[in-house]
Curated annotation (Swiss-Prot):
Keywords: Cell cycle, Cell division, Septation
Listed name of the protein: Putative septation protein SpoVG 2
Functional summary from the UniProt entry: Could be involved in septation.
Organism lineage: Bacteria, Bacillati, Bacillota, Bacilli, Bacillales
The encoding gene: spoVG2
Gene Ontology biological process: division septum assembly; sporulation resulting in formation of a cellular spore
Recorded coiled-coil stretches: none
Keyword Cell division: yes
Entry's family note: Belongs to the SpoVG family.
Keyword Cell division: yes
Pfam families: SpoVG
């Protein structure tokens, strides 16, 4: 199984969620609502979940083994970092343009 596409949207919240992602597997299957969470030990990926009638959250879709979970986390967090670098570059370019316009 290969993750063939990652779409990520950073979010600004008061909580620990930093982004929401969708991944495409083998160009055939999409999983939406994967969350990037800023946990006590750094960033991690939380699979889409739904609150049951008992109040507990249950994953809607999740990897069967730890290798697959690690692969998904690796590509999603890499995209998170890439998007962050692009945003930082865009802000730096805007600041440079406003300084040169003065």
């Amino acid at each position: 199984m290969q993750v063939t596409d990652v779409r990520l949207r950073r979010v600004e919240t008061d909580g620990r969620m930093r982004a929401i992602a969708s991944i495409t597997l083998d160009e055939e299957f999409v999983v939406h609502d994967i969350r990037v969470i800023d946990g006590n030990n750094g960033l991690f990926v939380a699979m889409p979940s739904k609150r049951g009638v008992d109040g507990e959250f249950r994953d809607i879709a999740h990897p069967i083994n730890s290798d697959t979970r690690a692969k998904i986390q690796e590509v999603v967090l890499a995209e998170y970092e890439r998007v962050g670098e692009e945003e930082a570059t865009a802000v730096t370019e805007e600041e440079s343009e406003s300084v040169s316009a003065e």
